[in-house]
């Protein structure tokens, strides 16, 4: 059985105004990851991803490049204990 994990991910670079959140939701849904993604006031994008470890890791890896118009400079990942608090993956405002 695959271990369930939670990751708090902060993506730095040109990641706002390039549909990063929208594409993160699409990727998350494809990977059966739950949680949220949002823009931060400083220009970063942050997400909380929960699911099977391999699926969450795949979404984190995708965040290293993001959608085609994005320019990712850095991805910071904080691994946390799985809480199982989400049923969906969506954009937060």
From Swiss-Prot:
Pfam family, one: Acylphosphatase
Active-site residues annotated for this sequence: 21, 39
Record carries keyword Hydrolase: yes
Superkingdom in the source lineage: Bacteria
Keywords: Hydrolase
Catalytic reaction(s) noted: an acyl phosphate + H2O = a carboxylate + phosphate + H(+)
Enzyme class name: hydrolase
Keyword Phosphoprotein: no
Record-level Gene Ontology MF annotations: acylphosphatase activity
Domain Acylphosphatase-like: 6-93
The protein's Enzyme Commission number: 3.6.1.7
Family under the similarity heading: Belongs to the acylphosphatase family.
Name listed for the protein in its UniProt record: Acylphosphatase
Organism: Geobacter metallireducens (strain ATCC 53774 / DSM 7210 / GS-15)
Name of the encoding gene: acyP
